[in-house]
Amino acid sequence: MEDLDTKIKTLKNMGVSESDAKDSLERCGYDVESAAEFIFSGQLEKSRLVPIMSSTSIASSLPSYQDTFFLPSPRKRRRLPGRIGTVLKPSALFPAIAPFLFVVFEIPVALNTFVHATCKGLLFAEDNASFHRPFTDVSAHLSSSSLSKYNHHSNHRLASPGWWYGEDSCISQSLDPRSVMQVQTIRAFEFLFSSHRLYLDTVHITAALSQVLAGLGNTNTSMSDGDCIAAFLSSYFSPPNAEFDSTFCSTLSSLTNSEKPTYIFNFKPNSTPDLRLSIESCLDLLLHPPSSAQKNWSWIKHVGKVFCCSLPGNNASGTPRFLLTPKIDLSKCIIENRDEMLRRYQLETVYRKTLLEWEDLYKRLTGVTLTDKDIGELLTDGQQFLEKRNPALSSHLQLLKETLQTKISTLISNTNATQHKLSTLYRGMQNKCTRRLLAVIIEPSIIYICLKNSAVQSNRNVSPSANHNEQWYLVRFTTSATISQDSPPCIVEPVTFEEVDLEFEKHISYHNRLLIYVDDDCEASTRTVIPTSVKNFIAEDNEYFDDELAGIIHSPTVSTRSSRSSDVSEYDLEDQGGLQLTVPHINTDVQCHRSRNSACEFPESMHVEHSG
């Protein structure tokens, strides 16, 4: 029992829940290394997967995904503790993105809505029976309350067709419900793929579309992202009418196969509705899927290529309104860090096991119990004790110590190099441009975001950040295996920028840290279409982050602490704190320059190429 407890504790130290640790150990013959690989390779979660069509019987992992999800009124939506903001943003758009939600996250309410919308002919042609084949028994899936609420919205043209956050309507009320659904789905695609504010991955959405298409009879599993999306749109929509001839839907459908890999995410200028994105919605949809809240490492295998979206500096014919370019393969970075961390735990396990054996031998031979000795001192004592009695074992212990020192130092070096690269992001080039810091992701469950300060003006106890018009928030997602009313999906609390800076500097993590910026092209044509909300958002941060990314890694105006270097810290075996990582702290004095290709350069793997 004691040995099993030790193995479970080892896996829990790797970020695995106790239930997952027990399950994986049972499946792998109680071998820790095999159990860890079974978990982190995704085999454990895969073995628990339930077919999509039976997901209606699963209780939702997020209790807040209930009937209140359908309420269009912001004041009626579920709110975070302290009335800081809204966790979920229900709106009339929800039915349009329901297929993605129920396939990716297996949310029953999303499936219910999708089934009902399907049968009502809002998403499909009513005379096309093939669309209804996978969903025959609607009444078996719909609750009476959700059905009545959805009926109410559909009878009133899906309530307000405004965007996700409850802003004023951007779509003409004269449109019929089917056209509204078309436009809102187009906007949903644009949001999911083209957020100005976050680095997005496409794996979830592509996988969702593939599975939906499979449910409709398409068994081609080797389609590319572009082919998959095009096939999905072809199945779900009739050709757009003249009013939407230049929308994302028609632009995408008209592309040839050779064009899709390069231009799949391009949009024609002035063709799409005015987007009014909210940072909370981005976080809800993209950074906190329910699966990542339940299992600390399960999200790793879902992370795909990361894209960055920018606004081109000209509005010439043929220039896309948005330009998305691949930046890094985030899954590779994370998995490499994961493997290194696993290796570290394996080394420490062997290391500590050896020390425990010699501690026991030391006690039996000398009668002295080593209770207040740390690892380094115990090693020294063991070596001195063995030097004359067993030189071979003494040499072996010394070799073990040196091997661990070397491997840990290498890990520190690699981790610091990665974090330093991500903390500087851009290099100084020619021609000035401006950008501002929007969010800091230290690890998947710890995110800092910057919002307008209006949400906390009534709270006199909150110290504002350096900018009185902005407020930083810590969004900490739960890492527990279950989510309940007492353990919400995330906690949001206001913080100062100095706290963000300090946490970024001192937090020990084996994840790549991400600094997320919004940039604006100072030489952009006045005809370039940029939503007003985005313009205002960019202008506010530019005042405080206009000197970022020029290679400067310290700022006396932000902190009076001595600047940290990016050199590798030594692993001190006598240091109770264990592994220490040196991370350069964040700067608000930020300046970067524009390259001749109208893009801020990313170092090496972070490089972004833009068409001129």
Swiss-Prot record:
Protein name per Swiss-Prot or TrEMBL: UBA domain-containing protein 6
SMART domains: UBA
InterPro entries: UBA, UBA-like_sf, Ucp6/RUP1
Pfam families on file: UBA
Keyword terms of this UniProt record: Cytoplasm, Nucleus, Phosphoprotein
Domain spans labelled UBA: 3-42
Entry superkingdom: Eukaryota
Positions of post-translational Phosphoserine modification: 595
Name of the gene this protein is made from: ucp6
Subcellular location: Cytoplasm; Nucleus
Primary site of residence: cytoplasm
Signal peptide: none
GO cellular component, one term: cytosol
Alphabetized GO MF terms: polyubiquitin modification-dependent protein binding; ubiquitin binding
Organism lineage: Eukaryota, Fungi, Dikarya, Ascomycota, Taphrinomycotina
PROSITE patterns, A to Z: UBA (PS50030)
UniProt-listed Gene3D superfamilies: DNA helicase RuvA subunit, C-terminal domain
